[in-house]
């Protein structure tokens, strides 16, 4: 059982919803990343999604694009991101860490080298936004061979064939994008999410985390009423952009604690 599977099994046993926050590695400044990861856990995160900065993040809205640009301007690389995971693991061996990003940095390192390095660092899952599931069997197999879960996105526009393709290669959990468009865009239609998730579960026997458009405790609680987990990203990245750096760790922990409280209410 992977660390992600154990986490979701424990949540189900406690009848709790998962909280999966996203931050961009190296933003707002490289020296804060590990402290921010620990702050997320202290605030009640169950899984951490750590964004690998990339120069052309096509699925991301302006907030996360700016975070990527800030991190890249400070020299953050995939190798550096793995080093931060390794540092985080020195004192936290329980909370799953999922790397989220794009194919280019992985392919530059080499898929096999990346799989070995990520696994050794303590990464639990990898979500590559621009890897189509239909062409991903060897990569997904490589991840699993190294004890990591390959995680995939599904959207309101995903066909049954796409859902089946994802179900064949995915493990850990699925990330359902609740809106068409890029991260951080408009508000969520809860009814359409509630109608869609049972259809996904018919094909894939995996927990489903829902993200894109979750901005506050109220939205998180509403989504938590229909999903296995809530993914929150752009709102956190915006918070870090707007907060003086010396207050970033405290502000992030407080915000996540509010979301946790709403999910558990």
Curated annotation (Swiss-Prot):
It comes from the Bacteria. PROSITE patterns: TRP_SYNTHASE_ALPHA (PS00167). Its EC number is 4.2.1.20. Keywords: Amino-acid biosynthesis, Aromatic amino acid biosynthesis, Lyase, Tryptophan biosynthesis. Pathway: Amino-acid biosynthesis; L-tryptophan biosynthesis; L-tryptophan from chorismate: step 5/5. One of its GO terms (molecular function) is tryptophan synthase activity. It catalyses: (1S,2R)-1-C-(indol-3-yl)glycerol 3-phosphate + L-serine = D-glyceraldehyde 3-phosphate + L-tryptophan + H2O. Pfam families: Trp_syntA. The active site is at residues 49, 60. Belongs to the TrpA family. HAMAP family: Trp_synth_alpha. Tetramer of two alpha and two beta chains. PANTHER family: TRYPTOPHAN SYNTHASE ALPHA CHAIN, CHLOROPLASTIC, TRYPTOPHAN SYNTHASE, ALPHA CHAIN. This is Tryptophan synthase alpha chain. It comes from Cupriavidus taiwanensis (strain DSM 17343 / BCRC 17206 / CCUG 44338 / CIP 107171 / LMG 19424 / R1).
């Amino acid at each position: 059982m992977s660390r992600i599977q154990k986490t979701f099994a424990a949540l189900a046993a406690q009848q709790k919803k998962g909280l999966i926050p996203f931050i961009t590695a190296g933003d707002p400044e490289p020296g804060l990343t590990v402290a921010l990861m620990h702050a997320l856990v202290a605030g009640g995160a169950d899984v951490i999604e750590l964004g690998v900065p990339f120069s052309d993040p096509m699925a991301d809205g302006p907030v996360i694009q700016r975070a990527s640009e800030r991190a890249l301007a400070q020299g953050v690389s995939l190798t550096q991101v793995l080093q931060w995971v390794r540092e985080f693991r020195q004192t936290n061996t329980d909370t799953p860490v999922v790397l989220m990003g794009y194919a280019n940095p992985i392919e530059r390192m080499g898929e096999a080298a990346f799989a070995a390095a990520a696994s050794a660092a303590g990464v639990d899952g990898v979500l590559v936004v621009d890897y189509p599931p239909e062409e991903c069997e060897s990569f997904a197999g490589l991840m699993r061979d190294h004890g990591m879960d390959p995680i995939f996105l599904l959207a309101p526009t995903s066909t049954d064939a796409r859902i089946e393709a994802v179900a064949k290669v995915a493990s850990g959990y699925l990330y359902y994008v609740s809106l068409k468009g890029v991260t951080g865009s408009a508000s969520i239609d809860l009814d359409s999410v509630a109608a869609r998730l049972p259809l996904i579960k018919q094909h894939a026997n995996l927990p489903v985390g829902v993200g894109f458009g979750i901005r506050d405790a109220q939205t998180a609680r509403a989504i938590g009423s229909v999903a296995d987990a809530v993914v929150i990203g752009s709102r956190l990245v915006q918070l870090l952009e707007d907060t003086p750096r010396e207050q970033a760790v405290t502000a992030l922990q407080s915000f996540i604690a509010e979301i946790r409280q709403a999910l558990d209410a």
